[in-house]
Amino acid sequence: MRLSRQLLRSTPFLTRAKPVSGKVSHFRSRTDLKGGSSNSSKSPDSVGDGASAHLRHIFDDQKYFNSFTKSAAETSGKVSSLPAIFSFRRSGLFCNDNLSTPHGLIDFSKNSLREAKSLVESMLHDVKSDPAGRLSYINKLDQLSDILCRVIDVAEFIRVAHPSQKWVNAAQQTHEIMFEYMNQLNTNVELYQNLRDILSDSSVTAQLTEEEIQVGEYLKQDFERSGIHMNPSARNNFVAITQEISLLGSRFNNEIHNLKSYWCEIPRYEFEQLEDSNLKKEILGYQSKAPPSKHSSQTISIPLVGHIPFTILTTCSIESIRREIWISLHNSSDEQIATLNNFLKYRATLAKMLGYKSFSHYQLEHKMAKNPENVVTFLTNLQKSLREKGVTEEIKKLYQYRDDSTISQVQKASTEDIIDGVKPWDRDYLLEKLQKASNKNLEELENINEYLSVGTIVAGLSELFKSIYNVEFVPVATLKGETWDQNQVRKVAVVDDSTKKKLGFLYLDFWSPKVLPSHFTIVCSRKLNLDIKSETKDKMRQLVQLDEDETSQLPVISLICNFQKSNDGHIGRFAGVENEKPTLLSLNQVDTVFHEMGHAMHSMIGRTDLHNLSGTRCATDFVELPSVLMESFSKDPRVLCKIAKHYETGEPLSPKLLAQHQTQKVMLDECETYMQSKMAMLDQVLHSEDVVRTISEDFANFDSTPIYHSLESKLKVFADTWSTWHGKFPHLFSYGAVYYSYLLDRAIAEKIWNGLFAHDPWSREAGEKYKNSILKWGGTRDPWECLADALENDELSKGDSRAMEIIGKDSL
């Protein structure tokens, strides 16, 4: 599934989105940008015009991209006859001059720490000695938050995505230093008291903007949620526990893909029953590398790497072998489960310290859902609806392909028999048989991937955004050192087509070897504090990328995917061999790109004067709406068949071919949603009151595994009561207690789609309505008011149980 990486903002100085992220001289001049705008909602008849073709080639043709980079450098006078890669003009990562080396990152963090401490000192002095100090206090608090987030966000990105271990080590060190200081600020009583007094002084608030007051209230709220009323000893304990949770979370995410064992032993007599002789031969070839076994003469060790385990799960008719392989693939290491148990215990401890019933109550207090009871009700109703709507029917289709099933048995089987009769290790095996049977009467399907190159999809998205938002993508050449892989990372400016002004920048790496699809906010939009003279243009030019007037910093987002390059040769690019065939995507991967671009456009359009509530810095159970909504566009033939072209012939994708592939794709659609609801329920249970009670009675021996198995038994449908898969669920940390957000936002997105875009997904009128009611506000407006405006339903503005009922009704 496609999940964006977002770090939850439970404290006022906590980092921005992570895990859901240009120097002006390298931006094309306004006269170079494709002009013209239209109020028409007509969809483009072709994405083959000059700007789209250029954008497509930037991503699909490595030689074209290299030529573009070289040409841009030569045109701007950066080099003479040397290729751009040998340019003497250097930059740092994301055009931050400090980030040219790992050591530079550490120095940047130390300098930023000094700057932050100096700003705090001046704020605390000015607020008492000068009336202007009270008026500028919230702006400076926001600037303080931005100074720290500017370091922590880029460090988090480097820690997760950078290919160099030296950079990763420096980022880890940086993150720990800055995060500890942020936690100290979150419990700084003097900072809080000044803010509280300012917000309660009507003579001051009368002179503040509405956004300044909103940000002030937001920061005050989070101070209070960080235990500001505790005694000094308790506050220090709070900071220490919060820091420990951060470290545990980092360890949890780093070990998420590790298995308890990379070998699975099965009886030799079962192995001999395997029908695939080539597979048997391949497995036997690994035996010399297998770890020693007490029963080596009676067993065979199957490696849990490469295609072997997945081939067994889809083709092996011996259930006992599938069972052992499936459990082994889903078992986390004992250390990973211990890490999970520890951060769950510490979260429950924090919630108790702050006077909340549970960590879930703490997290949901200011979210759309308001409390865990509403979430559990939403999920329970959703699961009931899904079971009635199609889950049972989908599993029944699988059940009939069990090796021991007869038509009579299928007809006589009860719903419980059917659900219990299909185990999790049966899913892929039976689905493979179902798909083969479904394909028997179909002609050989043409490969749809050839219509879906990366460049085609990016260019198509630009055309779509131009149609509905009047913004487009413009490629930008990068300086040496500006990206983590100059040969691979593409940079595009998001440009308002009516004004030709930049809204922000995207750094796109579709071929990362180490990161699942993710959206990282590197810099948030923010108006510079030039009027109160707490920062200067000259200094900010070295750190961020500014707008044309040099009065605001532009948002910078990095989108990372782990797509495989086509025709990767063994010689490699350093021998002068480049891929000529573009990277071709599956429909699921297209959904992923659309999803992540939804987050990106939220950051680009949701520009605010203060960074704390810009772009994706809104309620966590609202932040997925723009990304989930984009999946409705990627699934609509009126969109995909307009933008998808064969990478060689330029032939458009036919609706018939798309429909055939989509039919294959959604065979277990209801089951997939149900499984996601189980994960959301697990997230609630592991952050519930029961956990608080359990650790109060026996802190040391808390174990999440029995809780996981108990919930699986209760909710059924591919129930897992054997493995420790919950240790492989990254969002238990990054989305603790709010994983339901995806399902809630999917329900909201369905309402938005049907209310605005279902009639015409290329509609400028619908796009403007959506942009002005939801996207442009960032986090400065109550989400329920945004929805009430977008859907023209005043009942939603209350955000009560009735509003939740309206959203949940007939959804999904």
Curated annotation (Swiss-Prot):
Its cofactor is Zn(2+). GO terms for cellular component: mitochondrial matrix. This is Mitochondrial intermediate peptidase. Residues 19-49 are annotated as: Disordered. GO terms for biological process: intracellular iron ion homeostasis; peptide metabolic process; protein processing involved in protein targeting to mitochondrion; protein stabilization. Its EC number is 3.4.24.59. GO terms for molecular function: metal ion binding; metalloendopeptidase activity. Cleaves proteins, imported into the mitochondrion, to their mature size. While most mitochondrial precursor proteins are processed to the mature form in one step by mitochondrial processing peptidase (MPP), the sequential cleavage by MIP of an octapeptide after initial processing by MPP is a required step for a subgroup of nuclear-encoded precursor proteins destined for the matrix or the inner membrane. It comes from Scheffersomyces stipitis (strain ATCC 58785 / CBS 6054 / NBRC 10063 / NRRL Y-11545) (Yeast). CDD domains: M3A_MIP (cd06457). Zn(2+) binds at residues 595, 599, 602. It is found in: Mitochondrion matrix. The keyword Hydrolase applies. Its main location: mitochondrion. Residues 37-46 have a biased composition (Low complexity). Residues 1-29 form a transit peptide. The lineage of its organism: Eukaryota, Fungi, Dikarya, Ascomycota, Saccharomycotina. Binds 1 zinc ion. Gene3D superfamilies: Collagenase (Catalytic Domain), Neurolysin, domain 3. Pfam families: Peptidase_M3 (PF01432). Belongs to the peptidase M3 family. SUPFAM superfamilies: Metalloproteases ('zincins'), catalytic domain.
